[in-house]
Amino acid sequence: ADNMSLTGLSDEEAKEFHSIFMQSFLIFTAVAVVAHFLAWAWRPWIPGAEGYG
């Protein structure tokens, strides 16, 4: 176990994986935010003072 982590990845491989993971996560989150905004514009899921009227 010379200089290996629990995953078996080297430090460089772990950093590369992390950057790809974070980029993918941010893209997924951005798509989710846009989808929620569009769904809210189509049909808000929290009624206003007047209800769903």
From Swiss-Prot:
Gene3D superfamilies in the record: 1.20.5.250
Membrane topology summary: Single-pass type II membrane protein
Major subcellular location class: membrane
A GO-annotated cellular component: plasma membrane light-harvesting complex
Organism superkingdom: Bacteria
Record flagged with keyword S-adenosyl-L-methionine: no
Places the protein is found: Cell inner membrane
Transmembrane segments: 20-42
Protein family per UniProt: Belongs to the antenna complex beta subunit family.
Subunit note: The core complex is formed by different alpha and beta chains, binding bacteriochlorophyll molecules, and arranged most probably in tetrameric structures disposed around the reaction center. The non-pigmented gamma chains may constitute additional components.
Name of protein: Light-harvesting protein B800/850/890 beta-1 chain
Organism annotation: Halorhodospira halophila (strain DSM 244 / SL1) (Ectothiorhodospira halophila (strain DSM 244 / SL1))
